[in-house]
Regions:
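A short helix/loop element that forms part of the nucleotide-sugar donor recognition site in Leloir-type
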Residues: 47-51, 79, 189-190
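Short His-centered aromatic/hydrophobic patch
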Residues: 94-100
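Nucleotide-sugar donor phosphate/pyrophosphate-binding loop at the beta->alpha transition
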Residues: 72-78, 117-120, 127-146, 150, ...
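Glycine-rich phosphate-binding loop signature in dinucleotide/nucleotide-binding domains
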Residues: 83-90
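Active-site proximal beta-strand in glycosyltransferases
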Residues: 3, 91, 108-128, 144, ...
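N-terminal strand-loop element at the rim of the active site
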Residues: 5-72, 161-169, 176-178
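A short, active-site helix/loop in glycosyltransferases that binds the activated sugar's phosphate group
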Residues: 149-178, 183-188
């Protein structure tokens, strides 16, 4: 399979999850790439990207992605689409609200152009962190519901995230599954 992981912030647990998943997919023989925000950068991020890049046969691409929604998202989605179209993908896997939106909007555009790509989404919190009843939550949760029609599957890293998603967004048509992130042998102190 040809898989592209899309995420905004290459930091924290979300980034760790993407690195683990993309690395394991590559080791199992898949062609894998990562598309992430270019404005979030520190020494650790640079080191982790340099370590994973040799495994990424589809490359590591960095584009500017703002944290909050704005006009810059149009340019970023177009860049995501252009990059994804050049890769002849089987799967777009969006991580977090922004990566999930870019992956699913790109899936919609590629399908309209005859490319049968599938889009999977792992929320990792994102829009689920907004307090219900607020204007921000209403906007972001409505966007989640609208984007679900371009989603072939939802993957949650915990039962908690799956439950909160169902409570706040609802049980849409996309299949949902909990897949816990694993630990590597180096994560244990011996």
């Amino acid at each position: 399979m040809r898989i592209l992981h899309c995420l905004r912030a290459p930091v924290g647990g979300l980034f760790r999850h993407v690195l683990d998943l993309a690395g394991e997919q590559a080791r199992r023989g898949h062609d894998v790439g990562i598309l992430a925000d270019s404005t979030a950068q520190n020494a650790l991020t640079a080191r982790l990207f340099s370590e994973i890049e040799p495994l990424m046969s589809l490359g590591v691409m960095r584009i500017p992605m703002s944290r909050q929604p704005g006009i810059g998202d149009y340019k970023a989605v177009r860049a995501t689409l252009s990059h994804a179209q050049s890769l002849s993908l089987d799967v777009l896997h969006g991580h977090g609200a922004k990566g999930g939106a870019y992956a699913r909007l790109t899936r919609r555009a590629l399908r309209a152009r005859g490319q049968p790509v599938k889009a999977f989404y792992t929320p990792h919190g994102g829009t689920l962190n907004y307090q219900p009843g607020t204007a921000q939550a209403a906007v972001f949760l409505t966007l989640e519901r609208l984007l679900e029609r371009f989603t072939d599957g939802l993957i949650f890293e915990s039962a908690y995230a799956a439950r909160v998603y169902r409570e706040r967004v609802g049980q849409g048509p996309a299949p949902q599954r909990v897949i816990h992130n694993g630990l590597r042998p180096g994560d244990f102190i011996t």
